[in-house]
Amino acid sequence: MSYYFKNLKPDLNSDVEEDDGNLLESIMANKSKREIDEQESSDDELKTLSFGSLKKAETVIDEEDFKDTKPVHKKPITTTYREESFDEDEDSEDQSDEDAGFFEEDSEDETHHGQKVPKKKSKHAPVEQSSKKRVPRVRNIPGLEIPRNKRSNLYQDIRFDKSTGKALDSSIIRKRYQFLDEYREKEIDELQKLLQERKFLSKIDQGEREEMEQRLKSMKSRLQSMKNKDLEREILKEYENDMNKNNNTRYHLKKSEKRKVVQKWKFDHMKAKQREKVMERKRKKRLGKEFKQFEFHNRR
């Protein structure tokens, strides 16, 4: 290389450096102009927007910021462990230890997947029954159950059961089973004879004797009440037949009229002493009512 090229040094005021400086200045000037134009255009666009649209945009931005800043609460995952069954063979134990072990972890979401939490039902809610369930052959029909206060230890005859669907007519039943009165009278006579025997009374204690006397008394009253009902039924039947002899349409008495007819018949067929007792009882009853109506008995 020649001596001229070795001693050659770049000049600071050369033309190349001047061109580069001019380019940089022009680029920076263009950039500043572009930024100013963009700011002016954005200001012009904001001026054209209405206050309602600006308010909506502000609310949307606030909601997005609130969602971003809201803390996320993670549910704690509880793990349940299920023990697996294992065989007695050593090979199966080795395989189970290598694969999964004796315990497996199940998350709460997997165990309760697809199951709804049952809500507590009210005690006043109606009874629910599945339509897929078969109806049982033997069912409890409402109205046929005997209430507890009317239950007895006696045997219930199915001929008088409500499930037959027939109305119970006491007169018809009484005619069918009137022959039982003979057996009842025999039982009463036997009890009376037993209570009159001294040997029998010496063998039993006082409690058993009182129980037998009470039983005899109840049997007599029951039989007498049945006979009184039969008599009243016959009296009313005769009276209605006499009343409806010449009538085309049959006339039936009311309950109050029936009671008066029965009382009149009994009074007519009483003895003299019985009539006097009845009249005296009625007189005392009437005097008691009049005595209660006096002024000095009224409360002030």
Curated annotation (Swiss-Prot):
One of its GO terms (cellular component) is 90S preribosome. Keywords: Coiled coil, Nucleus, Phosphoprotein, Ribonucleoprotein, Ribosome biogenesis, rRNA processing. The modification Phosphoserine is found at S14, S41, S42. Residues 114-124 have a biased composition (Basic residues). Residues 184-248 form a coiled coil. One of its GO terms (biological process) is maturation of SSU-rRNA from tricistronic rRNA transcript (SSU-rRNA, 5.8S rRNA, LSU-rRNA). Residues 33-151 are annotated as: Disordered. It comes from the Eukaryota. The keyword Nucleotide-binding does not apply. Residues 85-109 have a biased composition (Acidic residues). It is found in: Nucleus, Nucleolus. Component of the 90S pre-ribosome involved in the maturation of rRNAs. Required for early cleavages of the pre-RNAs in the 40S ribosomal subunit maturation pathway. PANTHER family: RIBOSOMAL RNA PROCESSING PROTEIN 36 HOMOLOG. Associates with 90S and pre-40S pre-ribosomal particles. Interacts with CKA1, CKA2, CKB1, CKB2, PWP2, UTP15, UTP17 and UTP22. Belongs to the RRP36 family. This is rRNA biogenesis protein RRP36. It comes from Saccharomyces cerevisiae (strain ATCC 204508 / S288c). The lineage of its organism: Eukaryota, Fungi, Dikarya, Ascomycota, Saccharomycotina.
